[in-house]
């Protein structure tokens, strides 16, 4: 049995890609997209019809060019998501504009709009996850959306404080990042030789997984942002893992026994009182890595969102 099939015995595998053909090849349960992945996919000629449709929608649904570009971007994200849902049996994650990461109300408004666009294409909201950055405002937006039956995927998660606040808000799913945590520590104190058990990104997800299970939180833990297959194999047993096509390929090509590494702890504890905003900000602020990586992640997604807007604006 190849490693990918081995992992699928214990974990729900999700494709981290906007490339529909790549997703088709690996038979994942779900798929995740973000502005960077959409930008990459939008540059491929086979998806030109999705862009043309989004452009036509933008022209029809915006008065100014700025409004047309925003409308086209939203429609493009939904077009890709709807196509992906023809392939995966589960859900697709679609991201709210990263520039709204510190605005609860506008994040809620954008999320509702994206869900509405999906529903206009005949996609039920039960098949959509709305991705929001794990800022205090993003978590509060998700808390309200969950009450409306709009499930959320809280992304750019680097600290335990973020994970705890998400669970306390009752969000559907979190995406704790492994590779970007590894990158931060590797740049400062390189691990040579590499020991997966000491990988700070792997340890972060394990800690969150154990805490959630010990306190009976129902929020799904989906490890994300991997740099190497060892990180993925070390988290086998995690609720879900979202994996890029290049790493799915490596796992599919290697035949090796896969052992479950994450198992819910037998000991359980009562849940603590929910964190206040002040506690959240203080705890998150204790970790330079988490502060830097959350800020950087938001900036990078915003840059790619602007590039996507520029690409569409040139076609309007």
UniProtKB/Swiss-Prot annotation:
Q: Name one GO cellular component term.
A: cytosol
EC assignment = 2.2.1.2
Query: What is one Gene Ontology biological process annotated in the Swiss-Prot or TrEMBL record?
Result: carbohydrate metabolic process
Pfam families listed in its UniProt record: TAL_FSA
Reaction(s) this enzyme catalyzes, per UniProt: D-sedoheptulose 7-phosphate + D-glyceraldehyde 3-phosphate = D-erythrose 4-phosphate + beta-D-fructose 6-phosphate
Q: Does the keyword Cytoplasm apply?
A: yes
Q: For this UniProt record, give its keywords in alphabetical order, as a comma-separated list.
A: Cytoplasm, Pentose shunt, Schiff base, Transferase
Top-level EC class: transferase
In this protein, the active site sits at 131 (schiff-base intermediate with substrate)
Where does the UniProt annotation locate this protein?
Answer: Cytoplasm
- Give the top-rank taxon of the lineage listed in the UniProt record for this protein: Bacteria
SUPFAM superfamilies with a match to the protein in the record: Aldolase (SSF51569)
Q: Which GO terms describe its molecular function?
A: transaldolase activity
Q: What does this protein do?
A: Transaldolase is important for the balance of metabolites in the pentose-phosphate pathway.
- Which HAMAP family did the record assign? Transaldolase_1
NCBIfam families registered for this protein in UniProt: PRK12346.1, talAB
What family does this chain come from, according to its entry? Belongs to the transaldolase family. Type 1 subfamily.
Q: What is this protein called?
A: Transaldolase 2
């Amino acid at each position: 049995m190849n490693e990918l099939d081995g992992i699928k015995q214990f974990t729900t595998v999700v494709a981290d890609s906007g490339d529909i053909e790549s997703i088709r090849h690996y038979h994942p349960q779900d798929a995740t997209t973000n502005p960077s992945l959409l930008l990459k996919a939008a540059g491929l000629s086979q998806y030109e019809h999705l862009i043309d449709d989004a452009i036509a929608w933008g022209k029809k649904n915006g008065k100014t060019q700025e409004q047309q570009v925003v409308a086209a971007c939203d429609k493009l994200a939904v077009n890709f998501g709807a196509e992906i849902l023809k392939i995966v049996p589960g859900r697709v994650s679609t991201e709210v504009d990263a520039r709204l990461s510190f605005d609860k109300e506008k994040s809620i408004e954008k999320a509702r709009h994206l869900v509405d666009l999906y529903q206009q294409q005949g996609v039920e909201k039960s098949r959509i996850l709305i991705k929001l950055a794990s800022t205090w405002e993003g978590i509060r937006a998700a808390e309200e959306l969950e009450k409306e039956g709009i499930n959320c995927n809280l992304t750019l998660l680097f600290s335990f404080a973020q994970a705890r606040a998400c669970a306390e808000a009752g969000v559907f799913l979190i995406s704790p990042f492994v590779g970007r945590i590894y990158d931060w520590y590797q740049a400062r104190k390189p691990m040579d030789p590499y020991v997966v058990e000491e990988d700070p990104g792997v340890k972060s997800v394990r800690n969150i997984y154990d805490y959630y299970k010990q306190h009976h939180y129902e929020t799904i833990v989906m490890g994300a942002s991997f740099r190497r297959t060892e990180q993925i194999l070390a988290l086998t047993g995690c609720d879900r893992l979202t994996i890029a096509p290049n790493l799915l390929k490596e796992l599919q090509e290697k035949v090796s026994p896969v052992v479950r590494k994450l198992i819910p702890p037998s000991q359980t504890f009562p849940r603590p009182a929910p964190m206040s905003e002040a506690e959240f900000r203080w705890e998150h602020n204790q970790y330079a890595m988490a502060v830097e990586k959350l800020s950087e992640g938001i900036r990078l997604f915003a840059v790619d969102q602007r590039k996507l807007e520029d690409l569409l604006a040139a076609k309007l």
